[in-house]
Amino acid sequence: MNNTIESYSNENGCIYHGDALEILKQIPNESVDLIFVDPPYNIGKNFAGRKDKWKTDKEYLDWCYQWIELCLQKVKPNGSLYLMTSTQFMPYFDLYVRDKVTILSRIVWSYDSSGVQAKNYYGSMYEPILFCVKDKNNYTFNSEDILVEAKTGSKRKLIDYRKNPPQPYKTEKVPGNVWDFARVRYRMEEYENHPTQKPISLLERIVKASSNPGDVVLDPFSGTFTTCYVAQQLNRRFIGIEIQEEYFKIGLRRLGIASEYKGEKLEREIKSYQTKISKERTLFNFG
């Protein structure tokens, strides 16, 4: 790796502080089993003082196509790629990659409402995900590891009389392409100070399904490093990239790689409601 790129590692993987395009270029081709990409969406979000907004849509898409090409180079011939972006830009992603890889699923991550919703049109309640593979005849998909309850609407077990002898219908199934996972909220244990943090449960499904223990999982826009965290918990190896120093520090702490950075002790931010509870306990502690 280039010496100008800041990196930290442990026995499970490595995270890099710097520009994703530059760092991706230095990762060996066909060396990664699974890539999950959750890039800036070009919708004006504030990421630690850095605005998620390009001058034009064309500039944003041209930038996206660069890292998509690099990711396609880095993933193994039997590897998988999951791509996220906003609803308005996903059609461009879909058209761009469909003649380069096989799109197996167009996933809808559906979530509950929070805050103020649109009043003059139908507000967006989902984020799209493309599940792509290089070789549709040779890729990892561990269906048994991601089974969910097969809801029949019946209180009694349904019997399949087509079989001899008749047998109960299976109570579990592989999830469809509509995924219901709650967004990460402030009071959740997993919450970190980031405007678009993805839930652990979402990444668990992806990592379990499309990689095996010991495989390499890459996230070029790591944010709070949830992908790397899940990969480590599931005995995969990880590569994380993040350009924002504030979020890079979250990765160092969350992955147990470092407890200090540039002389600063890395600790979880105490939430306002936790401070209030602590003060109340102190107030009523007469012992």
Please report, for each region that a protein language model flagged, where it lies by residue.
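PRPP-dependent phosphoribosyltransferase catalytic core
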Residues: 249-287
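Core catalytic lobe of class I
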Residues: 2-249, 283-287
